[in-house]
Design a protein with these regions (language model features):
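Metal-ion/cofactor- or nucleotide/acyl-coenzyme-handling active-site neighborhoods
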Residues: 1-175
Length: 175
């Protein structure tokens, strides 16, 4: 990887099981990563850390966010595809050029729209767990499927990512 002065780095965090390893691996130098690039996360990730940008697509998650005791959505940028997003918090905005993709794909697309040309995708697993359990670190918590309810059509994730990568239209390197 070659970075230069024109490189604008983003880290886009998904909620797949692989993120558990990444969380442990990066925990000792999270502060350094904050200085290197902008951090985008999805849905319930706000429960664990403050991000530069949070993308929330599900209305139940938006309702949870609006009731958060720390008022996350009134203090930090939150993005969604729904009209009138201010009902969920003063910092909630519409995603420009929203394509109604899943939260992970929408977060990566938002990073590209914000001018990032080097994007690291972390925890975007795009497939079910080998054991058949739900592939999400927030499974069995509020607004998430139970551990045995993996009825997600993963082909849709592939389609969303393919559309997003086409829309990014070159000039962006994804890792």
């Amino acid at each position: 990887m070659i970075l230069n002065a024109e490189s604008k780095i983003a880290f886009v965090w998904g909620n797949g099981e692989s993120r558990r390893k990444a969380d442990k691996m990066y925990s000792n130098f999270w502060g350094d990563m904050r200085m290197i690039g902008t951090h985008y996360g999805c849905n319930a990730m706000y429960r664990d850390m403050v991000l530069d940008h949070l993308v929330v697509i599900d209305t139940d998650m938006l309702d949870e966010l609006s009731k958060d005791k720390n008022k996350y959505a009134d203090h930090y940028p939150v993005w969604t595809g729904y009209r009138n997003p201010k009902q969920w918090g003063t910092k909630v905005k519409n995603i420009p050029k929203n394509k109604r993709w899943n939260a992970g794909t929408s977060a990566a697309h938002l990073a590209v729209q914000h001018g990032h040309n080097v994007v690291f995708l972390i925890g975007h697993d795009l497939e079910p767990c080998a054991n058949g359990l739900t592939n999400n670190i927030y499974k069995s918590t509020n607004n998430y499927r139970k551990v045995f309810e993996d009825d997600i059509v993963y082909d849709r994730f592939y389609q969303d990512w393919q559309e997003m990568l086409t829309a990014a239209n070159g000039g962006v390197t994804l890792y």
